[in-house]
Amino acid sequence: MAGDTHCPAEPLAREGTLWEALRALLPHSKEDLKLDLGEKVERSVVTLLQRATELFYEGRRDECLQSSEVILDYSWEKLNTGTWQDVDKDWRRVYAIGCLLKALCLCQAPEDANTVAAALRVCDMGLLMGAAILGDILLKVAAILQTHLPGKRPARGSLPEQPCTKKARADHGLIPDVKLEKTVPRLHRPSLQHFREQFLVPGRPVILKGVADHWPCMQKWSLEYIQEIAGCRTVPVEVGSRYTDEEWSQTLMTVNEFISKYIVNEPRDVGYLAQHQLFDQIPELKQDISIPDYCSLGDGEEEEITINAWFGPQGTISPLHQDPQQNFLVQVMGRKYIRLYSPQESGALYPHDTHLLHNTSQVDVENPDLEKFPKFAKAPFLSCILSPGEILFIPVKYWHYVRALDLSFSVSFWWS
């Protein structure tokens, strides 16, 4: 049984009045709250937003809450029509405004921590599905809400040892003997110039040691710590062995629910918090990591670096694929087995024909169908077992396959 994975119904943690802290983030009057929406948003929706804002500033909480629900329902339909890339950003702003108003209404007279947790979930939905509004106000609201929640309790059940000692799934349970394979070289804190000349420019993978092992996350992060900092936050979770499988899907749940369902208890399915910009959503976690100095060798600005979290149980798999940017993969918890193939070997890796999966191989790396994919057997590769504190440099377009050998948390930095 999963146990209590939600934030408990306890008295609020008092650090000043919650409503006072939230109200201080808002413009003084409704006239100062600029919406600035484009022509694609119907006039009737703009009018509804203006009316909801007026209701909020007039203190008519119940009516404002009702209006915000209408805004959210209508804009949700717009967000889920067609492909995500084609959704107009103004509709994402409308959704974010609806989330802001609803969260604020919920917090005007909170009764217990469950009410604040519900408001926090609304904020997270705005952060995940909406667009930035009013100087990233949803981030600020979420941060305040977290300070007014009581300490998070870990999900009930036996927390696995770290690294995870549960039996691995039968299909991918073996730890490969990388001594039999050509391994990725390891270097201890190479100079920027040496890294640039020997690895960045020629596009050669390398594992960097002594660069990240002093980061706070290496000592602080555990299941309990992650639950304490992020337990009540809503995140996207991939369900299924790998994203190329037909039964693969995505869902939204809190971090507590994810840990309880896919890590603490014996799961029927594989769950993976993968490729999520968790550190933008929860800046407190971002304080525990650093951007590697080697990223300064790129052409882009620091704010253009994409930082993703990869958190899941033993057995999670990222199929063989390539990315359009340079990648530093930092291992924080657990170990991962990784295979790397040069872009020059693309013809032997049989990429999918579809536009959506053109950067992903059809080959199951550790159980290949060599009758269907005969060239794969002769494709040379590098491999490694990446351990906590190590950083793997994956050059742009380099094919890579990743399998978690333990309960694992990785951080990737995509840069140009």
UniProtKB/Swiss-Prot annotation:
Phenotype upon changing W310A: Loss of L-arginyl 3-hydroxylase activity toward RPS6
Comment on bound cofactor: Binds 1 Fe(2+) ion per subunit.
Effect of W414A: Reduces L-arginyl 3-hydroxylase activity toward RPS6
Amino-acid positions noted as binding Fe cation in the UniProt annotation, renumbered to this chain: H321, D323, H400
Record annotation: effect of changing H321A: Loss of L-arginyl 3-hydroxylase activity toward RPS6. Loss of peptidase activity toward methylated histones. No effect on its regulatory function on the circadian clock or CRY1 stability
Location(s), subcellular: Nucleus; Chromosome
Induction remarks: Up-regulated upon starvation, DNA replication stress, UV treatment and by camptothecin and etoposide treatment.
Phosphoprotein is among the record's keywords: no
The protein's name in its UniProt record: Bifunctional peptidase and arginyl-hydroxylase JMJD5
Main location: nucleus
Assembly with partners or alone: Can form homodimers (via JmjC domain). Found in a complex with RCCD1. Interacts (via N-terminus) with RCCD1 (via N-terminus); this interaction stimulates H3K36me3 and H3K36me2 demethylation. Interacts (via JmjC domain) with H3C1. Interacts with FBXL3 and PSMD2. Interacts with CRY1 in a FBXL3-dependent manner.
